[in-house]
């Protein structure tokens, strides 16, 4: 099942810089692992925002939630999930 996921990162101002840099490095590694596994299909930065739009290919809502909650920056994200369905006019 495909999902469009928007992730807006909202890091509190009182987070130590070194801790935040470690979180970003861990986040990058986790995101790349999921991309290599074929789960995180697409990843785009949203211009002008600390945010991204991504496409995930997972079994169901529970699997998606489980994966998103493993992201190191998850506690600092506002996440919007949109399940996707095949469009009848799409050319494959």
Label every model-predicted segment:
Residues 1-92:
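Conserved, structured core segments of small domains
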């Amino acid at each position: 099942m495909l999902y469009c996921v928007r992730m807006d990162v909202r890091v509190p101002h009182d987070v130590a810089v070194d801790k935040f840099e470690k979180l970003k490095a861990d986040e990058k590694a986790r995101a790349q692992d999921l991309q290599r596994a074929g789960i995180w299909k697409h990843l785009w930065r949203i211009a002008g925002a600390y945010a991204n739009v991504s496409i995930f290919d997972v079994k169901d809502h529970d699997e998606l939630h489980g994966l998103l909650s493993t992201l190191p920056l998850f506690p600092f994200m506002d996440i919007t999930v949109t399940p996707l369905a095949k469009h009848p006019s799409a050319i494959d």
